[in-house]
């Protein structure tokens, strides 16, 4: 479903956290030019997380990696029936060619597993309703991993005195921040590994109370970051959208802290594609970062240019637009953000697959089928490097119709090439990831 837009006022720094009911000491100060999706706080027992207010504003805090309320995975106890079971919510193809999203529940008892699956599916629908997800759904597999908790609900709901026994130890009032929904990250990893693959991880808590968190962790399983959300709250899905901006798009946060220092120029140009030390004129002159989008109307409102403030600093860094989802929830990705997200999809997924594995020997009596998961993808065929214009756009080819010159027994190479021609990706370096080829030997 689509969300109503939140107010455009952005609370920053301590004000944003204060809106959630917190002790100011929990607020982390600016960190220069880091990639939050891959960052882990220096002391391994704590993680840097993002905190999301109901008004759409975003702040940061550091929290324990372990939950004091964890009751799952206890030595000597057999897991409950159904615990760890994996169910596909959406299966578009083999994991080798897809983005795999893993949705893990917490606070759902054995009798509530049907509710968990409904909540998990709803959160995926909320995430995939946002562009560019909406146009690329078929690049994704979504897996629900069940946990069976001893008690229903989440610690801290409805009040901080409430304690629940749950598999992942999810809890509100983390670091004295009421709406900050923390989790035991090792327990999450122990369940994520049960899925075929984990590129994104979303923890859905059995609560209607608004809250969540965005964890900046890099797992050896391959996922960057964990998003926690309230399964019964229709606004919490936006937390997952923002977090995937980091993990898939490698985007920086575009919000900043009032009263913070100016970004130190000695740190150099940030690596992320959506913040820069330079104004629009300089980016255009240098043909750098989002210069190709400058002057265009952006889906998050306004025109792409250079707006001072971003990467946690109010001065010294610029963002492409006034207020995208990387600055506050309830917004759209801006044009440079959409470009980065699509490129991120294709770092994990491919625009061309086939039920017949590439390299499988074929003969003239075979029929070959390929799949194009994204609408509008162009498809071409070639034989031994020579284009076959008569086959352009065909997803099924009867090899008897393919001219195979030479003597009987000669082996030819048939190649399919697919390209996503989307105008949402302008950078030639990123566009290379939007093309894929598959080849098969064909014997005359």
Enumerate the predicted regions with their spans.
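Secretory targeting and sorting signals
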Residues: 1-28
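Propeptide-to-catalytic entry region of secreted or membrane-anchored zinc metalloproteases
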Residues: 34-191, 421-424
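Solvent-exposed loop/turn segments at secondary-structure junctions
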Residues: 106-111, 148-152, 207-211, 234-236, ...
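Short pre-active-site segment immediately N-terminal to the catalytic Zn-binding motif
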Residues: 115-116, 219-243
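Catalytic Zn2+-binding segment of zinc metalloproteases
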Residues: 244-260
């Amino acid at each position: 479903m689509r969300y109503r837009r939140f107010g455009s006022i952005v609370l920053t720094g301590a004000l944003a956290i204060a809106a959630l009911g917190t002790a100011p000491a929990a607020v982390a100060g600016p960190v220069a030019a880091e990639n939050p999706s891959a960052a882990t706080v220096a002391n391994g027992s704590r993680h840097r997380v993002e905190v999301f207010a109901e008004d759409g504003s975003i702040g940061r805090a550091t929290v324990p990696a372990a939950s004091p309320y964890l009751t799952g995975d206890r030595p000597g106890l057999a897991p409950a029936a159904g615990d760890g079971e994996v169910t596909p919510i959406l299966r578009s193809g083999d994991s080798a060619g897809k983005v795999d999203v893993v949705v893990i529940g917490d606070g759902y008892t054995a009798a509530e597993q049907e509710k968990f699956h409904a909540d998990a599916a709803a959160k995926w629908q909320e995430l995939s309703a946002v562009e560019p997800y909406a146009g690329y759904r078929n690049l994704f597999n979504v897996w629900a991993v069940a946990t069976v908790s001893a008690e229903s609900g989440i610690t801290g709901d409805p009040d901080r005195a409430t304690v629940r026994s749950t598999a992942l130890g999810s809890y509100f009032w983390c670091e004295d921040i009421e709406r900050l929904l923390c989790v035991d990250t090792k327990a999450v990893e122990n369940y994520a590994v049960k899925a075929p693959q984990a590129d994104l991880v979303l923890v859905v808590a059995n609560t209607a109370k608004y809250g969540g968190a965005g964890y900046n962790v890099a797992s050896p399983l391959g996922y960057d970051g964990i998003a926690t959300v309230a399964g019964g709250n229709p606004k919490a899905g936006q937390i997952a959208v923002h977090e995937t901006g980091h993990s898939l798009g490698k985007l920086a946060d575009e919000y900043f802290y009032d009263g913070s220092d100016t970004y130190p120029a000695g740190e150099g140009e940030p690596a992320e594609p959506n913040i820069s030390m330079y104004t629009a004129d300089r980016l255009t002159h240098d043909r750098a970062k989002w210069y190709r989008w400058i002057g265009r109307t952006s889906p998050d409102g306004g025109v792409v240019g250079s707006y001072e403030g971003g990467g946690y600093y109010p001065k010294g860094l610029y963002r492409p637009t006034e207020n995208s989802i990387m600055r506050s929830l309830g917004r759209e990705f801006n044009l440079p953000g959409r470009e980065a997200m699509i490129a991120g999809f294709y770092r994990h997924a491919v625009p061309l697959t086939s039920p017949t594995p590439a390299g499988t020997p074929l003969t003239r009596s075979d029929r070959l089928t390929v799949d194009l998961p994204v609408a509008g993808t162009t498809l071409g065929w070639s034989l031994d490097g020579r284009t076959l214009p008569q086959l352009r756009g065909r997803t099924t080819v009867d090899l008897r119709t393919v001219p195979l010159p030479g003597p009987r027994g000669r082996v030819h190479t048939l190649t399919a090439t697919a390209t996503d021609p989307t105008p949402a990706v302008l950078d030639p370096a990123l566009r290379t990831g939007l093309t894929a080829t598959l080849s098969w030997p064909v014997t005359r």
